[in-house]
Amino acid sequence: MDDFRNKLRNFLNNECLWVKNVACTSFTKVYCATTAVSPFFKPISPQGVPDKHYINVTLIILKPKKSHPYITVYINDLAVDCCSTEILQVKPVPCSHFSLIYFGPLIAPPHNVQIPANLSIKASKKSHLTKNQVIFTSKVIHPERLPDGYKSASLIGACAWYSEGAIFQHFLSTDYMSLCPAFKEFPSLSRILSLLTRCDDLSCVPCYGEKIHVNCQSGYTDSDCDGKSNSCPCITSCTALKKDIVPITGHRNLLSLLFDATIQHNITSIKFFSPQTPTTVNNVFCGVLDTGETVECTCEAWNLLMFSDFISRQMIYNCQIMKRFCLRSC
């Protein structure tokens, strides 16, 4: 049990962002979290195998007057533990509906404690990570002047990077966004290149991310959720996993954000360079003309952003692949 509780504690501390549930009362606090499947913590279904692409967690906290708080943890509607802890810190995140909860070592509860029923009221919120949340919390970074300690990075997908808790990604500049008020897509370079080069198989995992993602902002994932994502940097054309030059398959209007107007209509493919550290846009990819000639993209529309720690955590917790890339076992 000690080994299980250590793994459970690490999972709760390092892979969950908490949403306060409307079932809270003055005496009972209820928090919910939804997070992608963990590389380190494996909840088991009644059939004996993991059977979902998400982990829904309900946390019920009771604080008796003369003892430490004790907590009951439900995962995907199954009670997995009732335990106590000497340390429990709840910190609301400013300007969001999230809370961060830190758990000290989990220990056995008093012998007379009864496991409370799952009190949470399931109401999946429809909010998603927005471009404004990214823009207002991120830093614009010059690729040649990366902050100290961030020179070593891991490539995510075709054009994003992770280093020391932060995601680096090119984002459409606010000046260009103001010129395209009707543009509704998540304005990351990863998303734009994905739209240009993805295949037409809607169940393709690399191109659409099916059964890989959750939306942790919702606090709960419905069983019929398709697990796709419109914002995760892991989404990459399945063809790009096999070769560097990938044909353009649709959304050609988006080429105006990447290339000079005089050559857009002649571009047939994208060539990916897969740089291993954050760099300028023209070192990430180029265009390929119908003649086979390569042409540089234009950089003016794009800023390299260093996402805040909190936004980076949201994106990591949303994705099984990002978790495997970015999280360490604790």
Swiss-Prot record:
Keywords: Host cytoplasm, Host nucleus, Late protein, Virion, Virion tegument. It is found in: Virion tegument; Host cytoplasm; Host nucleus. GO terms for cellular component: host cell cytoplasm; host cell nucleus; viral tegument. It comes from the Viruses. The keyword Membrane does not apply. Transmembrane segments: none annotated. InterPro entries: Herpes_UL16/UL94. The keyword Repeat does not apply. Belongs to the herpesviridae cytoplasmic envelopment protein 2 family. Plays a critical role in cytoplasmic virus egress. Participates in the final step of tegumentation and envelope acquisition within the host cytoplasm by directly interacting with the capsid. Upon virion binding to target cell, a signaling cascade is triggered to disrupt the interaction with the capsid, thereby preparing capsid uncoating. Interacts with cytoplasmic envelopment protein 3 and with the capsid. This is Cytoplasmic envelopment protein 2. It comes from Saimiriine herpesvirus 2 (strain 11). The gene is 33.
